[in-house]
């Protein structure tokens, strides 16, 4: 069995990878992908801790988190499509300049 510290380290690395993607990228699609990675890392941490404590609470939180992530992804992609049709770009800086 893999220890708790290794498993939570993996979840933390995934979370940091998503956060790095959000901080570095200027494209809205990549920001949405980074956010999804962060949400999935948090869900993984819920499952790991629930398994460690021997309770099903982690799996319940995982189902809730995945449901919220799916909702966020569908709404986010719909907004991205609308922005792309209107501005013909997904670059945050260009959209901000065009808005003024």
Curated annotation (Swiss-Prot):
Annotated localization: Cell membrane
Molecular function terms from GO: NADH:ubiquinone reductase (non-electrogenic) activity; quinone binding
TM annotation in the entry: 4-24, 29-49, 60-80
Record bears the keyword Kinase: no
Record's keyword annotation contains DNA repair: no
InterPro entries referenced in this protein's UniProt entry, alphabetically: NADH_UbQ_OxRdtase_chain4L/K, NUOK/Mnh_C1-like
Keywords tagged on the record: Cell membrane, Membrane, NAD, Quinone, Translocase, Transmembrane, Transmembrane helix, Transport, Ubiquinone
Catalytic activity annotation: a quinone + NADH + 5 H(+)(in) = a quinol + NAD(+) + 4 H(+)(out)
Membrane disposition: Multi-pass membrane protein
Cellular component, GO, one term: NADH dehydrogenase complex
Signal peptide bounds: none
A Pfam family annotated for this UniProt entry: Oxidored_q2
GO terms, biological process: ATP synthesis coupled electron transport
EC numbers on record: 7.1.1.-
Superkingdom of the organism of origin: Bacteria
Entry's family note: Belongs to the complex I subunit 4L family.
PANTHER family linked to this entry: NADH-UBIQUINONE OXIDOREDUCTASE CHAIN 4L, NADH-UBIQUINONE OXIDOREDUCTASE SUBUNIT ND4L
Subunit-level organization: NDH-1 is composed of 14 different subunits. Subunits NuoA, H, J, K, L, M, N constitute the membrane sector of the complex.
Described function: NDH-1 shuttles electrons from NADH, via FMN and iron-sulfur (Fe-S) centers, to quinones in the respiratory chain. The immediate electron acceptor for the enzyme in this species is believed to be ubiquinone. Couples the redox reaction to proton translocation (for every two electrons transferred, four hydrogen ions are translocated across the cytoplasmic membrane), and thus conserves the redox energy in a proton gradient.
Name of the protein: NADH-quinone oxidoreductase subunit K
Organism: Baumannia cicadellinicola subsp. Homalodisca coagulata
Gene assigned in the entry: nuoK
């Amino acid at each position: 069995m893999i220890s708790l510290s290794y498993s939570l380290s993996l979840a933390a690395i995934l979370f940091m990878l998503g956060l790095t993607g959000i901080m570095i990228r200027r494209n809205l699609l990549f920001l949405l992908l980074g956010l999804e990675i962060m949400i999935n890392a948090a869900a993984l941490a819920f499952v790991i801790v629930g398994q460690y404590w021997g309770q099903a609470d982690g799996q319940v939180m995982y189902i809730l988190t995945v449901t919220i992530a799916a909702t966020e992804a569908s709404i986010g992609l719909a907004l991205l499509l609308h922005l792309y049709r209107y501005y013909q770009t997904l670059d945050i800086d260009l959209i901000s300049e065009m808005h003024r």
